[in-house]
Regions:
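Structural preference for solvent-exposed beta-strand-turn elements
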Residues: 1-352
């Protein structure tokens, strides 16, 4: 590429064209804060695998928010800490998290998903990659994310704002789990999509006895998968499109864990985690209501038990104090009675 008379010369094979300044920008072109520098001899000391980072981006970008009124959730969070570079994305219904080995300091930045489009493909062709963070702007907490390859340097200034505390949204306790082939599961879900005749189609999943059973809610179809299963027999309903997307991103063998029919579910594969909210059904609503009432009764019973324990402790303390008082009285020797002196009583004096 060569600048000539304020135009950009673009050569592709035998074709050559010229673009004037701002000619490629339209009314709907979104603004960007990305700086791109191209150099055929960019010296790069790699600190992360280019292909590994490209795969990580492809696994988190699909789960950023599409709505313009949620700009923070339209970003991918990059956070380097404790020898890991963690990429996080969320859209309010799903949360994707993946951690890569990274031992080159600490930092974090929020980068818009629009600025990251095409970066994964560029990284697949790069031989070396380096990720770093640097201070930017006037604020003390302003940060920029820098990605260097042997040809190009990308620099994104972090968007201002606080990302949700995603760690609290990842479930840690489960009552049922299954380990199965994600590719076979995608085929099973696609076979159930045909009788649904709709883009939005729910899928009921139940696993136990070494099988994962997928079915349409109206019993129009059912598919079974061999799997390693454990725990209780719980049925959960997921959006079919969300389920297929989750399985494709996980790829290979996937672990699927659930707590109950209304709590967040967890897909995991080789360090990658995807949290997906289930669809609410009448059964799930009833179970949630029953669980809330049970927890309320348990909390009430624990409060009563605690109050009784406190009362019992007070009673025991009072009895112990009385016993100690009696023992102290017994230790005192009786003193002989002495005659008491009579006190003089003064007559009242009249005041004029």
């Amino acid at each position: 590429m060569r600048a000539t008379d304020k135009k950009l010369k673009v050569a592709c094979g035998a074709n050559t064209g010229y673009l004037a300044d701002s000619q490629w920008i339209g009314d709907k072109t979104p603004p960007t804060l990305c700086d791109v520098r191209v150099s055929p001899n960019n010296s790069v000391k790699p600190n992360i695998g280019a292909g590994e980072l490209a795969e990580a981006l492809n696994r988190v970008l699909p789960f950023t928010a599409k709505e313009d009124n949620r700009p923070i959730l339209q970003c991918v969070k990059f956070a380097a800490k404790d020898g890991k570079l963690t990429l996080v994305s969320a859209d309010g219904f799903r949360l994707a998290v993946i951690a890569l080995d990274y031992d080159d300091g600490e930092g974090q930045a929020l980068v818009s998903r629009d600025d990251l489009k095409g970066i994964a493909n560029a990284l697949k062709r790069a031989k070396r990659a380096r990720v770093s963070f640097e201070r930017s702007g006037d604020s003390l907490d302003g940060m920029s994310l820098i990605l260097d390859t042997e040809l190009i340097r990308y620099k994104w200034r972090s968007m201002d704002g606080s990302y949700p505390a995603y760690e609290e949204l990842i479930p840690t306790e489960f009552n049922a789990f299954a380990h199965f082939d994600a590719i076979e599961a995608v085929k099973a879900v696609n076979s159930l999509k045909v009788p649904a005749f709709s883009k939005a189609y729910p899928i009921d999943l139940t696993f136990g006895n070494g099988k994962v059973v997928m079915a349409n809610p109206d019993d129009k179809g059912q598919a079974e998968l061999n799997a390693d299963t454990g725990g209780e027999a719980i049925k959960v309903r997921l959006d079919g499109g969300y389920l297929v997307q989750a399985l494709k991103v996980c790829g290979g063998m996937v672990d699927f864990k659930i707590t109950n029919s209304y709590s967040p579910t967890l897909f995991s594969s080789n360090g990658y985690q995807l949290v997906a909210m289930p669809m609410m059904t009448s059964e799930a609503s009833e179970q949630a209501k029953a669980d809330r009432e049970a927890k309320a009764k348990q909390a009430e019973a624990e409060a009563v038990t605690q109050a009784e324990a406190v009362a019992q402790a007070h009673t025991e303390a009072a009895v112990l104090a009385d016993e100690q008082g009696d023992e102290a009285t017994e230790d005192i020797e009786p003193v002989a009675d002495k005659p008491r002196r009579k006190r003089k009583v003064r007559e009242p004096v009249a005041v004029a």
